[in-house]
Amino acid sequence: MGRFIFVSFGLLVVFISLSGTEAGFCCPLGWSSYDEHCYQVFQQKMNWEDAEKFCTQQHTGSHLVSYESSEEVDFVVSKTLPILKASFVWIGLSNVWNACRLQWSDGTELMYNAWTAESECIASKTTDNQWWSMDCSSKRYVVCKF
């Protein structure tokens, strides 16, 4: 009897210690989990700014999807392609050119520019995750992540 209690107690300790690992990670209803993050595909089209705002309203810490690995990309493609078919979804990159330090080919610094007022945002293709620079005001589907 003592051995049974000892073994049962040991199994209980193992169960409790494992319950905090990724195996126990759970996303809210309607969200899919991958590598301790949650994702949801939305079939509404909106511009980039509205899409980012929309994501922040869906769950605490949620934003437009960002990628940390090619495996994560494959997971998101597996979720978007069946729902959205061949289309584009906004990802959490924008104003990429504003972050670059540009200079002329002769080495002088860029002091004057005539860029259009349109800022550029990045969308990914649902079929192969190629990234495309697009006008931020165009309407695309949304994938949120937290």
Swiss-Prot record:
InterPro entries: C-type_lectin-like, C-type_lectin-like/link_sf, C-type_lectin/snaclec_domain, C-type_lectin_CS, CTDL_fold. One of its GO terms (molecular function) is toxin activity. The keyword Cell division does not apply. One of its GO terms (cellular component) is extracellular region. The keyword Plastid does not apply. The complex is glycosylated. Disulfide bonds join 27-38, 55-144, 121-136. Pfam families: Lectin_C. Belongs to the snaclec family. Negative results: does not act by binding GPVI (GP6) and integrin alpha-2/beta-1 (ITGA2/ITGB1). Does not bind to platelet GPIX (GP9), GPIIb (ITGA2B), and GPIIIa (ITGB3). Potent platelet activator that acts via GPIb (GP1BA/GP1BB). After activation by the toxin, the receptor is redistributed on platelet surface thanks to cytoskeletal translocation. The indirect activation of integrin alpha-IIb/beta-3 (ITGA2B/ITGB3) also induced by the toxin is downstream the cytoskeletal translocation of GPIb. This is Snaclec mucetin subunit beta. It comes from Protobothrops mucrosquamatus.
